[in-house]
């Protein structure tokens, strides 16, 4: 039977519940347990697909095409279990399901209320998510409850967790509470009062935490841990210090050294083998001892909030691990390029344009792409970054001066990039879209097979056909492909059913390393294995730096 660990947060948001949950999962997996994770989001949106990256950060896409919270990306990077739609759900989905049941008459005329109907539905979603784990029936399901204790939005989720713990019985569920212990510089000490109040708030709901994870900018002294233990009624050895680290991949070892996994296993009456965290130690060793160094410019419009590109940043870090190269990322606002030109790019070893939506900043990105192409600087374009690379090539090489995307200019006569109106989803079902379709849940989503053209750089990089994850509604227009290919551009991968361009590149006679992909390879990169495309990109950046005579 699956045991459950509920992870809650207190005092403030953004303390790192997702990293803490993923790190615990990694330790338990290293002990031979089958583990899955779920994220419960208390916002009313059905999913984060239409939410602003400035508010929500990155939208992580699962293999089966769900637009989910970025924490699911952390889950997949820390453990081997793949996430699915059922691993993330929101208040919006819960209420949508309950209202649909009420309309069908499932409640037989009863008054539908938060308790028991909403809380029962939350429990059903949790158990369904755990049961659908790709690892088979999990030994442990770690359930991260979004938001902060005390938020009105989180109350139904916390109540559902309390009820579920009671229903499952002793040693079947436990609670881990992540809280802030701030350092007050003027007083010169850590303050435990916010944590005391946070635990008190949790106890008012009827939840008694078994473990406290205390976030601080430094290790919490024993005296403060004793005080927290006394006031929160949590054993002293279960008051665990989680201080700031320069790499999230150090957190599993940090938590294991303080006995978190031992406490959880004892509480859940599990007796797995000892933990083997040698892989994490090796990763940290590689991170801290690189042999080379490169600087890559990421040109986008969400650069003030790097959470918008979380998986991409991590994929570059994974590539650094597997190439022994420290990757420094410079975030460059594409609108500043529109105003000030491309001088800010001239010291870079490579340029990357990530995915995105909307017209704002696109001409700055196109200017950056033109600079990379003409200056022979390695270039990687992802999703929108590929589309803009095709537009730049069409304008400046092929001579289609009005080339554009219908996303930015619906009336452009040279629709080099246009809306996909029909495609097959990963289950073989035909999907159709028009300009009038809803924004939410209407993109080409999830993992799709990409056959690669023999003799291309793409084949050198991947070595075989691949399955990559997608999130887009616009695509390179096949009507212009003959003109683009006549100019030298190579379409190096296409979808097997609809013949949609999936990868483009320039031949080495035109450029040493210039690649665009319609999919999002960052979603499948892990610290264990890296990703061949990002490894090749970092190697190209290193070669460019060395070719310029700069010490790498």
From Swiss-Prot:
Residue positions binding UTP: 13, 191-196, 227
Active site: 383 (nucleophile), 520, 522
Entry keywords, A to Z: ATP-binding, Glutamine amidotransferase, Ligase, Magnesium, Metal-binding, Nucleotide-binding, Pyrimidine biosynthesis
Disulfide bridge map: none
PANTHER family in the cross-refs: CTP SYNTHASE (PTHR11550), CTP SYNTHASE-RELATED (PTHR11550:SF0)
Family assignment from sequence similarity: Belongs to the CTP synthase family.
Name under which the protein is recorded: CTP synthase
Source organism: Burkholderia ambifaria (strain MC40-6)
Encoding gene per record: pyrG
């Amino acid at each position: 039977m699956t045991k459950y660990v509920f992870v809650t947060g207190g005092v403030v948001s953004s303390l790192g519940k997702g990293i803490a949950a993923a790190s615990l999962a990694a330790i338990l997996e290293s002990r031979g347990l089958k583990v899955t994770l779920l994220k419960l989001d208390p916002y009313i949106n059905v999913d984060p697909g239409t939410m602003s990256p400035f508010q929500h950060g990155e939208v992580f896409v699962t293999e089966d095409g769900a637009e989910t919270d970025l924490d699911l990306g952390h889950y997949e990077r820390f453990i081997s279990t793949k996430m699915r739609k059922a691993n993330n759900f929101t208040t919006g989905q819960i209420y949508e399901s309950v209202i649909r049941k009420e309309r069908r008459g499932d409640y037989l005329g009863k008054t539908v209320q938060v308790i028991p109907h909403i809380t029962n539905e939350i429990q059903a979603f949790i158990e369904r998510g755990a049961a659908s784990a790709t690892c088979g029936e999990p030994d442990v399901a770690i359930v991260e409850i979004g938001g902060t204790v005390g938020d009105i939005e989180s109350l139904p989720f916390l109540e559902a967790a309390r009820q579920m713990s009671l229903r499952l019985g002793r040693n079947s569920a436990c609670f881990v509470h992540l809280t802030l212990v701030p350092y007050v510089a003027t007083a010169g000490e850590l303050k435990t009062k916010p944590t005391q109040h946070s635990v008190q708030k949790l106890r008012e709901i009827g939840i008694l935490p078994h473990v406290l994870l205390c976030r601080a900018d430094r290790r919490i002294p024993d005296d403060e841990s004793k005080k927290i233990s006394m006031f929160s009624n949590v054993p002293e050895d279960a008051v665990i210090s989680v201080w700031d680290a320069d790499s999230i991949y150090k957190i599993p070892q940090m938590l294991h050294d303080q006995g978190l996994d031992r406490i959880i296993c004892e509480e859940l009456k599990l007796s797995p083998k000892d933990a083997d965290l040698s892989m994490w130690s090796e990763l940290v060793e590689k991170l801290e001892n690189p042999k080379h160094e490169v600087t890559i410019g990421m040109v986008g419009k969400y650069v003030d909030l790097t959470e918008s590109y979380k998986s991409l940043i991590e994929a570059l870090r994974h590539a650094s691990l597997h190439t022994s190269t420290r990757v420094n990322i410079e975030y460059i606002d594409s609108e500043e390029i529109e105003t000030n030109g491309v001088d800010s790019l001239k010291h870079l070893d490579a340029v990357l344009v990530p995915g995105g939506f909307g017209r704002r900043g696109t001409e700055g990105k196109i200017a950056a792409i033109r600079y990379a192409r003409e200056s022979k600087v390695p270039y990687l374009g992802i999703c929108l970054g590929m589309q803009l690379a095709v537009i730049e090539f069409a304008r400046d090489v092929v001579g289609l001066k009005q080339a554009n995307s219908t996303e930015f200019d619906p009336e452009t006569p040279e629709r080099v990039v246009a809306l996909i109106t029909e495609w097959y989803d990963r289950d073989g079902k035909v999907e159709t879209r028009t300009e009038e379709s809803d924004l939410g849940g209407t993109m080409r989503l999830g993992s799709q097979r990409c056959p690669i053209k023999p003799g291309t750089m793409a084949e050198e990089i991947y070595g075989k056909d691949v399955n990559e994850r997608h999130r887009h509604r616009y695509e390179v227009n096949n009507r212009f492909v003959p003109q683009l290919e006549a100019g030298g551009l190579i379409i190096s991968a296409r979808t097997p059913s609809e013949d949609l361009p999936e990868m483009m590149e320039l031949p080495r006679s035109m450029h040493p390393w210039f690649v665009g992909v319609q999919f999002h390879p960052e979603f499948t990169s892990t610290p264990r294995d890296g990703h061949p495309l990002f490894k090749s990109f970092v190697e190209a950046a290193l070669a460019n730096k060395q070719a310029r005579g700069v010490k790498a």
